[in-house]
Structure formats: structure tokens, C-alpha cells
């Protein structure tokens, strides 16, 4: 416990908040190459086969990224755009792949929340 005089002389040091998306190096998105595309199972109360990919980013970091939406066309060596955002029931998955950009196609037959999944407006 510092004395009042020590606080007057030096003050208190601010705590530095830990960055949640360190691999993006401060960028909103990063380009990367898929090194492995596979499925994994979620944490305890949930049950599914979640689609994920190991991606080597342009920042030379390899991360695990979630592939959102139903169905995808990704395979090894696909170029993808990665953004921050974790998947709560997949431990260690702190990034998501942006649908509809680079080699990633948008979700087919998507009617609602289309911009999130790179789906074009249907011609009526």
C-alpha cells in the first residue's frame, strides 16, 4: 500500500486491457489462406458438427476461424477474409470468416440477414 506522498510523486499505473483479436494486429479484417477445413463438436450442453478452418493470415499467424451459415465451398488453399468475433460454444475459436468475399461464396437461398452471409437479393 503506497503512502499519499508516493502517490503524489508517481501516481497509479493504468491496467492494460488484453486485446481479444491479437492476430488481426489492429486491423478490422485480415486476408488468409486455409490450411485445413474440418468440423468440430461444441462444448457441453450443445451438440453439432461446427464447420471451422485453420487459416494462415497475412500477419503470419495461424488461427482457427468459424465458417458461418449453411453449406460452404472452402477447401485447402482457399483465400478468405477473417474478422474478429468468437463462437461461444467452440473453445479457442475467436475469429470468423466473412462470407461472400474472396474465394468464399455467400449462403444460397438466404432471405433474412443477407448482408451477414454475402447473399445477393433474389430477383422476384
From Swiss-Prot:
Residue ranges the record marks as coiled coil: none
Protein family: Belongs to the universal ribosomal protein uS12 family.
Cellular component GO terms held in the UniProt record: small ribosomal subunit
Taxonomic lineage: Bacteria, Bacillati, Actinomycetota, Actinomycetes, Mycobacteriales
InterPro entries for the chain: NA-bd_OB-fold (IPR012340), Ribosomal_uS12 (IPR006032), Ribosomal_uS12_bac (IPR005679)
The protein's role, per its UniProt record: With S4 and S5 plays an important role in translational accuracy. Interacts with and stabilizes bases of the 16S rRNA that are involved in tRNA selection in the A site and with the mRNA backbone. Located at the interface of the 30S and 50S subunits, it traverses the body of the 30S subunit contacting proteins on the other side and probably holding the rRNA structure together. The combined cluster of proteins S8, S12 and S17 appears to hold together the shoulder and platform of the 30S subunit.
Gene Ontology biological process terms from the UniProt entry: translation
Subunit structure: Part of the 30S ribosomal subunit. Contacts proteins S8 and S17. May interact with IF1 in the 30S initiation complex.
Name of the protein in its database record: Small ribosomal subunit protein uS12
Protease as UniProt keyword: no
Residues carrying 3-methylthioaspartic acid: 89
Residue stretches of biased makeup (Basic residues): 108-118
Recorded superkingdom: Bacteria
Sequence segments annotated as region (Disordered): 105-124
Amino acid at each position: 500500500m503506497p503512502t499519499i506522498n508516493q502517490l503524489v510523486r508517481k501516481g497509479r499505473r493504468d491496467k492494460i486491457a488484453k486485446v481479444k483479436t491479437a492476430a488481426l494486429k489492429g486491423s478490422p479484417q485480415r486476408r488468409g489462406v486455409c490450411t485445413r477445413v474440418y468440423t468440430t463438436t461444441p462444448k457441453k450442453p450443445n451438440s453439432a458438427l461446427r464447420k471451422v478452418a485453420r487459416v494462415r493470415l497475412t500477419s503470419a499467424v495461424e488461427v482457427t476461424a468459424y465458417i458461418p451459415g449453411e453449406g460452404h465451398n472452402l477447401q485447402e488453399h482457399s483465400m478468405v477474409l477473417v474478422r474478429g468475433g468468437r463462437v461461444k460454444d467452440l473453445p479457442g475459436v475467436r475469429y470468423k470468416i466473412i462470407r461472400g468475399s474472396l474465394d468464399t461464396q455467400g449462403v444460397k437461398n438466404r432471405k433474412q440477414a443477407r448482408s451477414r452471409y454475402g447473399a445477393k437479393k433474389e430477383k422476384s
